[in-house]
Amino acid sequence: GGSSRSDMTLDELYADLDVNEATPVKGTVTLDTPDLYAELPEIDKYPLAVEGNGDIDIEIFTSGEKAGKDNDSWLIDVANSFNGSGVKTADGKSVSMSVRSVPSGTAADYIISGKYLPDLYTPSNTLFGEYAMSNSGSLELYADRLVGNTAGILVKKDSGYTTAADAIKAVQDNKITMGYTNPQTSATGLNLLLTLLQDGEDNFTKFNSNIPY
């Protein structure tokens, strides 16, 4: 017998509750400028894709599309080939190359903060190199690019969108949905952000309002 809980009134359910009073705890809020050095993870989070063992070892930070797997392993192949070639300096010291794959923006932050400094840095494009140098990163431009890399937007062949502007307008009109990478760490996302901002803040806001989160 007796009523099931589904038949009980709200007041009857309240009567079953045990209430304890606790001392309110204030949250800690800091208005200090974030410490970039402290916020960055230890470099071990990004292990070496190629580890050189020469008397002189040159470490290069690279974006993932040059140090990944299969078709994205170009720089890894180059480094392994170099390391196997027996290059030596005039005084007989062996020279090797180490490759570490780090997202372009994160790599720039390591350089700006001084938390970890590679000998060479090849981001997805020059934007992050300029970003690092403009924020007091200790860099000198050796070459505009190491290998060609073109940014683009992929759509279905029969979509009718033939330019980036067409695709952006379609997103703004809520006809298609698009995702993009974090512009603070990825050159792809940064390219798109700058493309949108070329036509003003309203253009970016209208686009971003239709981006799923």
Predicted regions and their residues:
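Intrinsic-disorder/low-complexity, polar/charged segments
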Residues: 125, 186, 209-213
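N-terminal segment of the mature folded domain
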Residues: 3-185
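Ligand-binding pocket segment of bilobal, Venus flytrap-like solute-binding proteins
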Residues: 199-213
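Bilobed "Venus flytrap"/periplasmic-binding protein-like clamshell domains
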Residues: 182-202
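Generic detector of well-ordered alpha-helical segments enriched in charged/polar residues
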Residues: 108, 168, 193, 205-208
